[in-house]
UniProtKB/Swiss-Prot annotation:
Residues 699-708 have a biased composition (Low complexity). It comes from Pongo abelii. Its main location: cytoplasm. Residues 1-30, 53-90, 244-342, 385-411, 425-495, 685-708 are annotated as: Disordered. The keyword Aminoacyl-tRNA synthetase does not apply. The modification N-acetylserine is found at residue 2. It holds the Pfam family zf-RING_2. One of its GO terms (cellular component) is plasma membrane. This is E3 ubiquitin-protein ligase Praja-2. Residues 1-10, 333-342 have a biased composition (Basic and acidic residues). Residues 550-570 are annotated as: Mediates interaction with TBC1D31.
Amino acid sequence: MSQYTEKEPAAMDQESGKAVWPKPAGGYQTITGRRYGRRHAYVSFKPCMTRHERSLGRAGDDYEVLELDDVPKENSSGSSPLDQVDSSLPNEPIFEKSETEIPTCGSALNPTTESSQSFVAVHHSEEGRDTLGSSTNLHNHSEGEYTPGACNASGVQNGIALVHTDSYDPDGKHGEDNDRLQLSAEVVEGSRYQESSGNTLFELENREAEAYTGLSPPVPSFNCEVRDEFEGLDSVPLVKSSAGDTEFVHQNSQEIQRSSQDEMVSTKQQNNTSQERQTEHSPEDSACGPGRICSEQNTNDREKNHGSSPEQVVRPKVRKLISSSQVDQETGFNRHEAKQRSVQRWREALEVEESGSDDLLIKCEEYDGEHDCMFLDPPYSRVITQRETENNQVTPESGATAGRQEVDNPFWNGCGDYYQLYDKDEDSSECSDGEWSASLPHRFSGTEKDQSSSDESWETLPGKDENEPELQSDSSGPEEENQELSLQEGEQTSLEEGEIPWLQYNEVNESSSDEGNEPANEFAQPAFMLDGNNNLEDDSSVSEDLDVDWSLFDGFADGLGVAEAISYVDPQFLTYMALEERLAQAMETALAHLESLAVDVEVANPPASKESIDGLPETLVLEDHTAIGQEQCCPICCSEYIKDDIATELPCHHFFHKPCVSIWLQKSGTCPVCRRHFPPAVIEASAAPSSEPDPDAPPSNDSIAEAP
């Protein structure tokens, strides 16, 4: 740390127009008066995020990034500034320097260098996508070919080094936010690498360059130069990971090697770093343009001036906060182009679905409504895409490491999953780490579901995320699969809004009855009906929506025809009608039985003869009914006796109207009241009293005549 503190006086002497560093709590801030105006910088330290958020850049909070700005050289020597760390930083060796510096600035990578380790650099712009392929070999070159230059690196305790550089180009079209070079070094621990590995991945989008460094030296980062060939030196480790800390070390030798076997460095703009620094470089040091990697400039001047130039000062630069949510809102999203690029990824996935590898690097970025996935194969076995073949900028690599030529399906699964999740609206694009971890394994589960039949379609059940959608077969084509992905997104969104359960509710109503359009179906109430044995049963067992068997009502009254025509009558009303009709049938049966009994009695008692009927005595009814006793009405016709009515008395002393009893005796020779027989003896008995003199009658003339 002593050599860092010695640089501060030189910094103030060289840049007299800049204020001394204030040291607020949590970060460093400075105000720089420059010809482009005052710019404020604030650097803070935050803990590093999880792997998913680091690799896919889904963090939603605003974050600060380290930035390096090109500062015009004020010394005549033109040497590039060197890294310096303030004494207030944590007291642990983060960066050591020596006479020999490793150049890490914009030099175009030589695509013709021999390599056993390769990387793919993909460039996205509004006009199209350019692919730059370059290979670097860290093991097959001799020592001492590193061009001296400035190497700016930052070490963090949690295994992530993040530097966000901004080349402030006043003549640029896109202003301050465009010409910037972003570097993020991520050390991912694994157990499959048994040897040092390194590769570099650059991505240029909207005049932005991102460098993914997995090289043994701190791979060309911001504003530094890289030779066409890198050498793999096996003496001193540059990056070492112990207890979660990463240390970047420049040794006094040109032998630099990455010796940690379980490390892998990926680049991504991060919002959480434990330590951040900002450095400034001269315009000559940065040659990054809108569509190219920083090309090598003034290499000879650098080599001459490096030894004689004094130590330079690294000054922080003011930078406005950048958040992924702001970028998502400001950048338009072009779904059509995104689908086309997704088709490219599916074609690549189909080619390598039989292979496997666990450690893969995925870099996904959004650019002008497009999002593409940049992948880096740790075994350095190249996968040539169709777009790369068309551009003729990438050639298949040979001599890949034995046993490391398989690409794992989970890599492609994660890549395709990113497309599916990213196609959502900007509001739902930012997922937490838990959502990523839950969604990644469920979208694409391997080749078993890829082999499903082409007739199958995507199905989404409400509220069941565990039901994974089945992909169409390879015969359906990648374009159809991509369209199905978009349909799946729409289904998920409507599912959250509650539309899918409503559709399923309509399906139930339509399938339950042919009369689903009738309004009464939704208000049908349960009712009960009588079966053939007069037992109550639930009509729901007969039909769900009043689709009953109308043959049960064939023998009912005519009113049921109306009920049959109007099927949406209240079921309770139908129940009452059915019950009443059953009771009526029972009454008719009872009456028929009684009639049958009466017929039997009539047959047993033959009718009386006409003579006997005519011989019945007749009585004239008086006003006081004294002639007929206490009877007030006729038992047959139930009519009251009135004056001057003719009544007849049977031998059983029951009085009836003469016409009524005559009709009855013609049908049955019994008394209607007591069922007593009316035999001919009755006639004889009636004739005998008629032969005897009536005591009440006046004496006859004979008796009167005999009296004298």
